[in-house]
Amino acid sequence: MIRRRIVGFLRRPLGSEGGPLVSPIVGLVRPLVYPVNRAASPVTAVSPVVRPVGMRFISGPVEREAIRAGISNNTDFLHVQNILLQKDQERQRRELLLKDADNFFERFKVKTKWVLIRGNRPFSKDEIYTLFSWLLLSQIVWIVVGTTTFLSLVIMASNTMFAKEFVGETLGNILNNNKYINGIDFTFKDAMVPEWKKKMIRFHNVTMKSNDKDDTKGVSMNLKLNQVEVSLSVVKWLSGKGLVNDISIFGISGDISINDKKESNVESLINWVTESNPTYELNNFTINDSSTVIHDKANNKHLNMNIYSLVIPRLRFDHLLTDIFSADVLVGSVNDSLFNIHKRQNKLLPAFFSDKGRDNRSKTIDKNENDGRFTNLRLNAININELNLNRTGAFNWIDDGTIEISADIMIPNTDENNEGNGLKTLLGYPGGDPLVNKNTPENKYVVIDVKFKFKDLKTKFPNEEPKLSSGEKILSLNELKPVIAYVNSRSGFIHFLTSLEDSNQSRTNVESVDDNKNWGLSNISIRRKKSYPNTTVISSKPYWNSTSEDNERNLPLPLNQEIIKFHNISVQDDNELVLRCRIVQNVEQLENLSSLKISKMWDTITMEMYMDLLKVVEDWEYRNKNDWMKQWGATFASQLLLVGFGAMV
C-alpha cells in the first residue's frame, strides 16, 4: 500500500498539490519504488508507469513521513559507500608511497606523515604549531603526573653519560645552595637507583655534615644515612607544600652536638627545618634503625637516642607536635630507656573523656566535637639527671631519682578538608545552633592525661624558689619545706639502707661491733641486682576443684602466690611518688612550635603537678596529725590509768 502511494505521489506534476517539490528527490526515491537495473543509467532505468485502474493517491503526513524515511536510508547507504571508497583509495595510495620508498628513513617518514596528516605533503604552519603545542603539553602532563619517574630517568641518564661521583656532587651542590638549609652540606657518595615498583628514588650513603663556616646556630651534626627513598610531586609543590611527597630513611648513625653559646639554640635542631617553610608537608615520613648520640656541651652530658621504627602518615611543619603525637608507630630508647607512641588498642575511651572522669578545674570537652584519635605515650624509668629535670627552675629541689611517664592523648582532627567534619558542622549538635561552626580551630582542643611516677627521689633545699619558664614563682621556700619533708619521709629509710650497703661494699676490713652499735642496726644486707624483681613470685596450680561457695563469691583463681619480699622493700612501695594531671590546650596554641618547652603547655603541666603534689602533702600532714593525736590521747589515757591504779594502791 505504501509503495502504491509513493508511486502516485511521484507521478504528479511538479508544483501541484501533494506533488514532489524538488526534482532531485525523484532520483533518490524512485530506486526504492521501482526495481531498476544498477548497470543502466538512472535516467533510462526508470520507465513511465501507467497508473492502474482504481488506484487512489492520498496526500498527507503519512506519505511524506514515508518519503523522508526512504530518503534518509538511501542517504546513509550512499554515505557509507562513499567512506569505504575513500578508505580504499587512501590504502592504495599509501601502498604506492611505501612501494616507491627506497630505504627505512623514507618509509618511516611516509608512515609518520600518514598517521599525522594522511598524506605525503609538507607540513603547514598550523600543523607545525599544533604538533609543537601537543608535544609541549604532553611533556608537562608527564612531568606533573610522574614527577618521580621523570627525575629518576634524568638522573639515571646522567649516571650513564657522566661519572657517578660527578652526579652525586652536583645533587649535593643543589641542596647546599638552598637558602633554607644553609649550614648543612649534603654528600651523595653512590649513584641513584630507581625503585619502579615503589615509585621512589633511592639514594645510598648520604652524608649530612655541618660546615665550619656557620657555627652560630649552636648545633653541629655529622650524620650518615645508609639509604634514603624519596618520591616527588609537582602538584604538591605548586600548592606550596613542598616538592617531596614521601620520604623513608633507613639506618641513621652519627653525632649531634649542642654548643653552649646560647641557651635558646637547643631548639634550633628542629627550627632549622621548620623555619625554612612552615607550610611544608610530607604525606608519609618513615625512619628505621636510627642511632645517634646527642652531646650537650653546656651540661657535659650525652644522650643515646635510638629510633627503631617511626611511621608518621602526615607530617606538617606547622603542626609538628600534633603530627608526632598522631604517629602510627614510634618506638625507640633514650639511654636504654624504652619509649613508644601508638594508637590506643582498646575500643573503650579513657576515663577522663567520659562524664564520670571529668575534672571541674579542667575545661570539659565533648569528644564528638573533636572527632580525633587517641594515642598512648609511655616512657620507661629513666634517671632525672639524664633528662636535666633537676636543672630546670621548676624542679630545682630534686637532686636525684628516676621518673616514669605514661600519657593518654586525644588529638582533634585538624584537617580542614575533612568531609566528616563538614557534615557534622552542617547538621550541628543537640543543644546548640546548627548554623554555628563548632569544628573551627578555635573550638578544637588537645586533651592529655599524664601520670608521673617518681621513685627513689633525693631532695635538697634550693637557694631560689621554683619558677616557671616565664619567671613566675610557683612556691615560696617556706611552702616548699613540707614538700621536701614529705618526700624525705617516704624515701629516707630506703636511702639509709642503700647508703649503708654502699658503705659496706667499700670497706675492706671488718668493722668493729661498736661501730655497728652506733648505727643501731646490724651490718646485714641482701645484695641484689637492679634487674631482680621487687617481689619473688612462685607459680602455683589453679584451684580447679573450687567449691560452690567460692563461685558464689566470685573469687578469682590464684595463679601466682607471693612468698617473700626483700627486707629493704616495703609492701606499699613507699619510695614511689605518683602524680596525675590533666591538660586541656587549644590546638591553635600548638601550631608553629617545635617543643613543649616553647609552648605554655609545659608550664601548665608543671602547675598541675604541683597542685596534685600539694594535695598529697596536705593529706599526709592531716594523717600524721591524726596519728599524733591518737597516739597522744592513748599515751595520756594510759598515764591517767596508771596514776589512778597507783592512787588506789
UniProtKB/Swiss-Prot annotation:
**Side of membrane Mitochondrial matrix, spans:** 15-134
Which Pfam families does this entry report, sorted A to Z? MDM31_MDM32
From the UniProt record, give one GO term of the biological process aspect. Answer: mitochondrion inheritance
Please state where this protein is localized: Mitochondrion inner membrane
Mitochondrion in keyword set: yes
* Reported function: Involved in the organization of the mitochondrial membranes and the global structure of the mitochondria. Also required for mitochondrial distribution and mobility as well as for the maintenance of mitochondrial DNA nucleoids structures.
Write the protein's name.
Mitochondrial distribution and morphology protein 32
Organismal lineage: Eukaryota, Fungi, Dikarya, Ascomycota, Saccharomycotina
Question: Which gene holds the coding sequence for this protein?
Answer: MDM32
